[in-house]
């Protein structure tokens, strides 16, 4: 899914207030030291964004922000993001050139604004991340996009795999076999690239990497850098991850539209730890179909969001996995 998937032209009238945002950040900090991501939509549309970023950083939260490449992403805005103490800024890049990227985003000029944002952040010492959503329309350009990621000096390439929802339809997605081909490309890229590679909604990439490393053995060529993959191990929707919407709804992820509560009435930690939805998502033995029988169910667990989007059952097998346990 990309930012146009459930697009609305104006801000929601019932979105969280600044004070509610502050209270939310305090609840997040009570978890320990999680990574806090401000995303959207476009978080720059909130006049209090910099106030909330500063609050998060002063609370000791590792904080990142994912603005949209719009005219709001000025040099001054990027400098203010840095000055708030933000760890990293992420921007989306879905093609190696303007026709591909702007065609995907549906906004002329988005490609140039994205490159400007990434390059300016690098100039002023703000770490960057590039997010790419893989679809059948840009899969053939992944090597060129990876070259762009290296060119702009990004620290991380976060590759999103499609969850058909909103305007992102199943016809845009890859086949299960194509997923494996992309996994091979990402694995080989991660060996030599000057940046880390991370996947989102492709939990079975962990299974692919585990199988490759097992096949290579200790005497084989150097394995892919373990950093981001090791940090992802076992993380899934509602399992090491929680998403709070602009109106306070508590979801297992931004791609699984099943709410377990609302921070306006429910303590975040209580929902995360006790809500039946979250508890079910953290039980790999409760998964159905081949995911429930899979040797890698604790490492991987499949995309719960994709299972729900394509089958209506968040505990079903991930339809885009070729592995047969």
Which residues are covered by each model-predicted region?
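Canonical Radical SAM [4Fe-4S] cluster-binding loop centered on the CxxxCxxC motif
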Residues: 1-16
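Cys/His-coordinated zinc-binding microdomains
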Residues: 4, 295, 304, 322-325
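Radical SAM/AdoMet-radical enzyme domain recognition
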Residues: 15-39, 45-169
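Short microdomains enriched in Cys/His and/or Lys/Arg
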Residues: 18-30, 310-325
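Short, acidic, Ser/Thr-enriched surface-loop or helix-capping motifs
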Residues: 151, 244-245
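A structural motif corresponding to the C-terminal lobe/cap of the Radical SAM core domain
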Residues: 151, 169-195, 231-232, 313-325
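C-terminal accessory region of radical SAM enzymes
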Residues: 177-224, 249-302, 306
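Short, small/polar residue-rich loop motifs at catalytic or cofactor-binding pockets
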Residues: 235-239
